[in-house]
Amino acid sequence: MSMDIKGNLTEIPLSENAILHQSGVSFFRIFTAYRKEKKIRTEKIVSGVISRRAFLDIEKGKSVLSRENWKFLMHRIGIVTDYFETVVSRKELKDWRCREDICLFVCEYCEKAKKLLEGYRNSHIKMSNIERQFCLKIEWLLSRDEKSGEELYKLSEDAVCCTVQEDWKENLSALYVGPEELEAMLLVVWSLLKKNELMDAFRLFDQIQRYPKIHNWEPRMREMICAQIALIGIKLYERMQKIDIAYKIGIESLELLRQQSSQRYVYPLLVELVRIGIMLEKEKSEELQQFLKFQKAFAILYEENKIPYMRVWQCGSIENSYDVGMVLKRMRMAQEKTQEEVCIDEKGFSFLNVRQLSRIEKGENRPSTENFQFLTRKMGRELDWIMPMLETDSIEVLSMRQDIIYAIGMRQWKKAKNILEQLKTKIRAEDYKEPQIQQEIQFIEAASLLEAQEISIEEAQDRYFQALSCTFSLEWLSQKELPFIKREEGIIISNIANLYRKIGKQEEAQGIFKRLYEVYEQQQRFLKINFPACVVALGQYSGLLGDRKEYAYALEIDTINLFCELNDFYLMSVGELLYNQAWDIYESDHIKNKKQYQKKFLCAQQFAYFNQDQDCIHFLKVREEKYLK
């Protein structure tokens, strides 16, 4: 029997980390530990981005590190930002969305991209170095067929020098740069090719290509730059009449993208591999035929979802970032409190006036760190601007956690369990009982046991409730509106709802799914991407709607889910979402809609092959007779 979610408010244990909670304390502890381990001076990391003095003020909590600066600095020391959740201002999210729109149009709709770039520049008179670098890279791409090689060379150099102040042409390996900066350097290589300065282009390209390996970037970091390196490398080696090497680096890049389930620049890379493969007389090879199938599947998917085939990608992801105004408003609404009530402290004094809170909730202002933390604590949560997924100082532990999440996404349960056992040995004894660490361990162990059919659905649900209660009051589940929910909490809540569905409690399941989606819907519509918990919840909710024979609504949910997934670079769920669409269409009218569901099913198969998702490949194989014959 499942745990009573209407029980007493769960006491969430406050760790020492939480008691000492200051702005960014967890992040800076991790950042400093990693920097010292690698023997990197702070000045080397922050150079060209922010001053040493400004960084010290941020460390002391006197000011807040912007999301862009934080991401940029993390990338410079080779750490992906997926290991953290961030609470950011509405302006930062709007700026990201503006840049994303420019990125979408720059390759296929140049005039529209030019207008958007001009608008972005006009609205950002005082640009940061990072923003200026972005704009110059876009300007280079928009003018590459209009300007001379010399003009493009100057433009690309200027882009690099926005953030790189040291000698980067001769001694790149000694510097700490991120994928964003390597991209700008690749434009310098492209410019040198346009100037016919082949050897200079090769010398710089060779340094860029070797940089990720020299600095021991993990695959998740290399994924952000591998395709760009390959595409420029193909141009370079083709000019040097070494197309076999061009083909090889393209293959290596594609393999890394497939291992990471990433679509970052994959379509232009497939186009180039097919073109060069034909030049090498490989057109009849099984490998090239598979590339053609991938290319066709991507083309169908992009066409149906009105997404450009060719686009630019921003480095990193924004899927773990939350709008501070939406966070505070959701928490207040969940507690059914007025703005006046939350602006008063325990002694009855007003620490914030209603007008200020109203502007914060509307996204017009960002609260001070003190007010943000006071408000969130008052409403039952311990939040910070930057929060690691687990209470640890170890990047290795956070990386292993991400490996577990990926393995679970691929339904590789034995692998996930093995990594979890290794992770336990890496966690310090004093950290082992931390709420998020316990939550992660309990949830993964319960999910693994359920998958192996070693526990019943009811027992698994009880364990999910127990895992959730490590950080989240179970009483909140019975409220009219859910409060702000962190990534892992959302995934656990969705799985709880899905187990209600499996034991036939459809009303309970639907109620949770609907309220959970409401948490993410507003920001999903604004950013046009999914949150990890959102893609899980919508996928499982679609299954419930299918059980209820609400096929049209299920298809609508799956279409929204797929579109938002395609707007980010991770493709892990795409094969499953395409199959969901095929199932919706088949069940609604399998005679009338035959062409539609077959097209979806065939695409799903190609994406399962692309992701090397053996479980999904097998799942679809046994259903071929139903959908294809």
Model-found features: residue ranges?
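Tandem amphipathic alpha-helical repeat scaffolds
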Residues: 97-106, 134-148, 180-198, 225-239, ...
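A short, Lys/Arg-rich alpha-helix, primarily the initiator
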Residues: 2-37, 307-336
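Structural signature of alpha-solenoid helical repeat junctions
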Residues: 92-93, 131, 173-180, 218-228, ...
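Short alpha-helical DNA-recognition segment
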Residues: 38-57, 336-359
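Helix-turn-helix repeat elements of alpha-solenoid scaffolds
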Residues: 104-119, 145-169, 193-212, 240-252, ...
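Alpha-helical adaptor scaffolds
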Residues: 185-246, 495-516, 521-575
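Flexible helix-coil transition and linker loops at the boundaries of alpha-helical arrays
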Residues: 83-87, 120-132, 161-178, 210-223, ...
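DNA major-groove recognition helix of helix-turn-helix/homeodomain DNA-binding modules
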Residues: 68-83, 368-385, 629
